[in-house]
Amino acid sequence: MAELNKTKVRKELRTERPSIYSFELDEIKQWLTDNGEKPFRAAQIFEWLYEKRVSSFEDMTNLSKDLREKLNTRFVLTTLKTAVKQTSQDGTMKFLFELHDGYTIETVLMRHEYGNSVCVTTQVGCRIGCTFCASTLGGLKRNLEAGEIVAQVVKVQKALDETDERVSSVVIMGIGEPFDNFNEMLAFLKIINHDKGLNIGARHITVSTSGIIPKIYEFADQQMQINFAISLHAPNTEIRSRLMPINRAYKLPDLMEAVKYYINKTGRRISFEYGLFGGVNDQVEHAEELADLLEGVKCHVNLIPVNYVPERDYVRTPRDQIFAFEKTLKSRGVNVTIRREQGHDIDAACGQLRAKERQDETR
């Protein structure tokens, strides 16, 4: 049996039977051609994967038995197993998925008036080391394959199928730094955006980075219509370095230059995520400083009242202070909103459920 074209297969993929969810339509067409099959079968395979959401290759009944055997020999469908599922009173659902090698990752379904949004994970753990985040506890174990990211959305969609609902948007803001897994992230974006894939519109997809500057330039050059966000969390270098050690490598002034390049290249505005930490970055003077930093930048600021993480020392900003911060930014002409909080009664903070399960395993 012909192998997949190695120039097309990303180096992060496992050499043994990778998930078929890792491959774009053109890659499957090429594999079919190399194995004596008609390339139009690729569209049929995509239909079985993303519209009918089958659980095995045997269920792909309009494919020949020989082709189904070839698929089963070369690929697996998915390696995700649901280990834990939590449901909040507000409808938020958090999934802990176990991977083929025993590692676990988190995925969150958030319900909004405008639809259902899925927050996906791109890495097992994270190397960035943000001092407020549960995702970095235990460090980085490995990157996810595109198929492991795609399968998160498919798994959540299968859960929604029970109530005839649909995933309407995707945010890449789960565990890990997406730009640390750049090629697999791009493949994921193309697969879920494809009209024969999950067909999620580009403007309903958001990717967030902590600020890996070279990849911001590379992402801008992709000219994708994907929404783009940066985890900023500070109005100046001193505070950002305290909260986010990555700022020591990729400094704030250089980050802002990359932001301007992205905006000029794509014509799109950028979002800044700004977590409010009591007594650290949440004073009115910090809001004034943030407004100075963002002056003339085509952007939106998303203020985030932080979730409590037991392993971290930060405290929540009082509600009236959050509103004062927002009011100050608005008075300076900054487009700003306060993120609606969800999942209070479950392990909602990013990486929190995974960290909790890891603690239970070591007891």
Swiss-Prot record:
Q: CDD domains attached here?
A: Radical_SAM
A single GO cellular-component term from the record reads: cytoplasm
Q: Which InterPro entries match?
A: Aldolase_TIM (IPR013785), Methyltransferase_A (IPR040072), RlmN_N (IPR048641), RNA_MTrfase_RlmN (IPR027492), rRNA_lsu_MTrfase_RlmN/Cfr (IPR004383), rSAM (IPR007197)
User: What's one Pfam family here?
Assistant: RlmN_N
GO biological-process terms attached to the record: rRNA base methylation; tRNA methylation
Superkingdom as given in the UniProt entry: Bacteria
Q: Tell me which residues bind S-adenosyl-L-methionine.
A: G176, E177, S208, S231, L232, H233, N307
> What's its catalytic activity?
adenosine(2503) in 23S rRNA + 2 reduced [2Fe-2S]-[ferredoxin] + 2 S-adenosyl-L-methionine = 2-methyladenosine(2503) in 23S rRNA + 5'-deoxyadenosine + L-methionine + 2 oxidized [2Fe-2S]-[ferredoxin] + S-adenosyl-L-homocysteine; adenosine(37) in tRNA + 2 reduced [2Fe-2S]-[ferredoxin] + 2 S-adenosyl-L-methionine = 2-methyladenosine(37) in tRNA + 5'-deoxyadenosine + L-methionine + 2 oxidized [2Fe-2S]-[ferredoxin] + S-adenosyl-L-homocysteine
The compartments listed are: Cytoplasm
Manner of cofactor binding, per the entry note: Binds 1 [4Fe-4S] cluster. The cluster is coordinated with 3 cysteines and an exchangeable S-adenosyl-L-methionine.
Provide the Radical SAM core domain boundaries: 112-345
Misc note: Reaction proceeds by a ping-pong mechanism involving intermediate methylation of a conserved cysteine residue.
Role summary: Specifically methylates position 2 of adenine 2503 in 23S rRNA and position 2 of adenine 37 in tRNAs.
Protein name according to UniProt:
Probable dual-specificity RNA methyltransferase RlmN
The organism's taxonomy opens as: Bacteria, Bacillati, Bacillota, Bacilli, Bacillales
Gene name for this UniProt entry: rlmN
